[in-house]
């Protein structure tokens, strides 16, 4: 039975999502600033956990962090034709400052290829300066017309990596390294979200890129969510901003650049992949609080005994588990159970006088609401048991999400089958169509090519739209 204040998924999935965001206390609407949200402490704590996991991987692959200006001269954006065309409708401009009109307007960073390209043109001189591998954590502004918390907001938080290389091969290697070893690895292992790694179609690729790679995840309504992108920019931005280097033969060459990023959309992906009608569900590796202890007592004498037992029990958890003790006296145990379930804490431990006598505690798993997920276990060896259970929950969430995706993905051979399948999930099909064909399909079905999977079949088949023979398969789906 769904929680009060949460619309059941089957009734209205979109409203269910908004209810989770508010009821789990993740964010608030910033009504006075169009399309923006306030990250409340729980929501921001999840973002901090995402930052830590990604930052470790980014640094482990040889990158360092820096920070570049928020304001970008408008003329910079105009230097790369495809880029400006792709972002022009979303750009916010600053035209006055200090009470005067500016000689040249600034745009508020929609992405940083242009401003970073300007500085890279100053920093790169020789092949000895390459590769240049820099990441920044920043906020971004894109003037979105239709917003939704975490998924699409006017201002959002993200990381964006920008690198410079001597050859196209090096740039391509970098692009795929980030895709596989940073993004896919993090999202699957830490967030327990299975992803499809693939190449974007010409229609869907990043404005100004040579090639765009992505990871795509399926949400519980069958729609796709682009969880991360990695772009080989070729020499487009290097030529626009004169990023050149002198090679070993003392010849001046244009460099090859990449950019890649993930954002707070990942919080939206987490909510829509794992949560249920009872509230938020957070994978243990990412959970700010992994275990909550709810002491149960009826009077001051029992409280003293129970709290002493709780302190002994949790003493060895420090440094091993992220936990909270809910010792609020003005709330009933039932209210606390409900609240922590709503907030998605992976494990709840209950302990009262009778449990102390028996040398046991009650454990409730968030991924299995109700009696199914509740058990009584000895206090002896509890720390190891909880650690193992957290990992079991992590793997169970991944398997459940993977099973859901597999159950809602189908191979389709005809356009009619495609139209039916995108109503419920991913349509995998052979594709030899044009960008114009893809646009027509989007107009008719609201589905796009989410990616051209890197894992391709060996045998040929017929294009779902044109009937031409091809060996290329794609994933069509509706998307966030």
From Swiss-Prot:
InterPro entries, sorted: aa-tRNA-synt_IIb (IPR002314), aa-tRNA-synth_II (IPR006195), aa-tRNA-synth_II/BPL/LPL (IPR045864), Anticodon-bd (IPR004154), Anticodon-bd_dom_sf (IPR036621), Pro-tRNA-ligase_IIa (IPR002316), Pro-tRNA-ligase_IIa_arc-type (IPR004499), Pro-tRNA_ligase_II_C (IPR016061)
GO molecular function, one term: ATP binding
Enzyme class, spelled out: ligase
Catalytic reaction list: tRNA(Pro) + L-proline + ATP = L-prolyl-tRNA(Pro) + AMP + diphosphate
Main location: cytoplasm
Single Gene Ontology BP annotation: prolyl-tRNA aminoacylation
SMART domains assigned: ProRS-C_1
SUPFAM superfamilies referenced in this protein's UniProt entry, alphabetically: C-terminal domain of ProRS, Class II aaRS ABD-related, Class II aaRS and biotin synthetases
Enzyme Commission (EC) number: 6.1.1.15
Segments forming a coiled coil: none
PROSITE patterns named in the record: AA_TRNA_LIGASE_II
Locations listed in the record: Cytoplasm
Reported function: Catalyzes the attachment of proline to tRNA(Pro) in a two-step reaction: proline is first activated by ATP to form Pro-AMP and then transferred to the acceptor end of tRNA(Pro).
Family (UniProt): Belongs to the class-II aminoacyl-tRNA synthetase family. ProS type 3 subfamily.
UniProt free text on domains: Consists of three domains: the N-terminal catalytic domain, the anticodon-binding domain and the C-terminal extension.
Quaternary state and interactors: Homodimer.
Official protein name in the record: Proline--tRNA ligase
Organism for this UniProt entry: Roseiflexus sp. (strain RS-1)
């Amino acid at each position: 039975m769904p929680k009060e204040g949460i619309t059941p998924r089957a009734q209205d999935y979109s409203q269910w999502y908004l209810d989770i965001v508010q009821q789990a206390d993740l964010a608030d609407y910033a009504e006075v600033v169009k399309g923006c949200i306030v990250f409340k402490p729980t929501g921001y704590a999840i973002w901090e956990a995402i930052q830590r996991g990604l930052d470790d991987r980014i640094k482990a692959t040889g990158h360092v962090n820096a920070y570049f200006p928020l304001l970008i001269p408008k003329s910079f954006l105009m230097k790369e034709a495809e880029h400006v065309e792709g972002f022009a409708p979303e750009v916010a401009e600053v035209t006055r400052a200090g009470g005067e009109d500016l000689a040249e307007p600034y745009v508020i960073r929609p992405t940083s290829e242009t401003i970073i390209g300007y500085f890279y043109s100053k920093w790169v001189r020789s092949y000895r300066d390459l590769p240049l591998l820099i990441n920044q954590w920043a906020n971004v502004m894109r003037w979105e017309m239709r917003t939704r918390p975490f998924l699409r907001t006017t201002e959002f938080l993200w990381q964006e990596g920008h690198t410079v290389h001597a050859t196209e091969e090096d740039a391509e290697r970098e692009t795929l390294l980030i895709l596989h070893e940073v993004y896919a690895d993090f999202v699957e292992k830490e967030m327990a979200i299975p992803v499809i790694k693939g190449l974007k179609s010409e229609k869907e690729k990043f404005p100004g890129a040579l090639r765009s790679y992505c990871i795509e995840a399926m949400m519980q309504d069958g729609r796709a969510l682009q969880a991360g992108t990695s772009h080989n920019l070729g020499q487009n931005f290097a030529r626009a901003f004169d990023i050149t280097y002198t090679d070993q033969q003392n010849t001046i060459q244009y460099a090859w650049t990449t950019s890649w990023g993930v954002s707070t959309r990942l919080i939206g992906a987490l909510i829509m992949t794992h949560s249920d009608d009872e509230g938020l569900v957070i994978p243990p590796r990412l959970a700010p609080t992994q275990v909550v202890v709810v002491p149960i007592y009826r009077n001051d004498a029992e409280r003293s005994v129970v709290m002493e037992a709780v302190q002994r029990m949790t003493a060895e958890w420090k440094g091993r588990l992220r936990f909270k003790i809910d010792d609020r006296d003005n709330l009933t145990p039932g209210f606390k159970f409900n609240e922590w379930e709503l907030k998605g804490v992976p494990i709840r431990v209950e302990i009262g006088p009778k449990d102390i006598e028996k040398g046991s505690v009650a454990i409730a798993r968030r991924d299995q609401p109700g009696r199914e997920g509740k058990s009584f276990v000895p206090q002896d060896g509890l720390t190891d048991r909880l650690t193992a259970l957290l990992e079991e929950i992590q793997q169970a969430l991944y398997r459940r999400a993977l099973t859901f995706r597999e159950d809602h993905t189908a191979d389709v051979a005809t356009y009619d089958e495609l139209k039916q399948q995108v109503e419920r999930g991913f349509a995998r099909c052979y594709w030899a169509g044009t960008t114009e064909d893809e646009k027509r399909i989007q107009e008719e079905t609201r589905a796009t090519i989410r990616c051209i999977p890197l894992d391709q079949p060996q045998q040929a088949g017929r294009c779902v739209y044109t009937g031409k023979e091809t060996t290329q398969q794609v994933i069509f789906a509706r998307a966030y």
